[in-house]
Amino acid sequence: MTEYLLLFVGTVLVNNFVLVKFLGLCPFLGVSKKLESAIGMGMATTFVMTLASVSAWVINTFILVPLDLVYLRTLSFILVIAVVVQFTEMVVRKTSPALYRLLGIFLPLITTNCAVLGVALLNVNLGYNFLQSAVYGFSAAAGFSLVMVLFAAIRERLAVADVPAPFRGSSIALITAGLMSLAFMGFTGLVKF
């Protein structure tokens, strides 16, 4: 149990996908203008990353490795992610039409989110078992969501703040992201891998 807790804390805080590995920057900067859309995107991405991580482990372990087709790993993972995203889109459309309209084009763009493919490939490269893959996928998504929600909250406050003209828009957003990355560096000694 301690191993899974360390994996969770290490992935969310120490090895955050956005601030440390620089994966998923497009939705991080694109969807984080409003807190509501960041929360919705975070929930959808959490669902997709967890399911894609587990699905990729199953496909790699039971199909690609036994049949010696590991060279098709990236292509097969992209297909798995596309199927999971389509499933997520159908679920969100049925359960929350308002969230579906709010996310708009960003929901299908989860397919091209490099963080989703990154978590699937890292699971395989790190040699995780099924449960570790599920925890790692969920942890990576939780870290992604945490950072995106925090960033959206900060950007909403910056929208009404008196920011100097040269720093308005994407300039202050990138400065804020850099400061968040520095803040998360403080967690570096928390977990040793």
From Swiss-Prot:
Main function: Part of a membrane-bound complex that couples electron transfer with translocation of ions across the membrane.
State the similarity comment.
Belongs to the NqrDE/RnfAE family.
Transmembrane stretches, start-end? 5-25, 47-67, 72-92, 102-122, 134-154, 171-191
Note the superkingdom of the native organism: Bacteria
- PANTHER family on file: INTEGRAL MEMBRANE PROTEIN OF SOXR-REDUCING COMPLEX, ION-TRANSLOCATING OXIDOREDUCTASE COMPLEX SUBUNIT A
Give the UniProt record's GO annotations in the biological process aspect: electron transport chain
Its lineage reads: Bacteria, Pseudomonadati, Pseudomonadota, Gammaproteobacteria, Enterobacterales
Q: Any keyword Transport?
A: yes
Give the quaternary structure: The complex is composed of six subunits: RnfA, RnfB, RnfC, RnfD, RnfE and RnfG.
Keywords on this record?
Cell inner membrane, Cell membrane, Electron transport, Membrane, Translocase, Transmembrane, Transmembrane helix, Transport
Known EC number: 7.-.-.-
Q: Which NCBIfam families match?
A: PRK05151.1, rnfA
Name the UniProt record assigns to this protein:
Ion-translocating oxidoreductase complex subunit A
User: What Pfam families would the database entry show?
Assistant: Rnf-Nqr
Record membrane topology: Multi-pass membrane protein
Query: What does the entry list under GO cellular component?
Result: plasma membrane
Subcellular location as annotated: Cell inner membrane
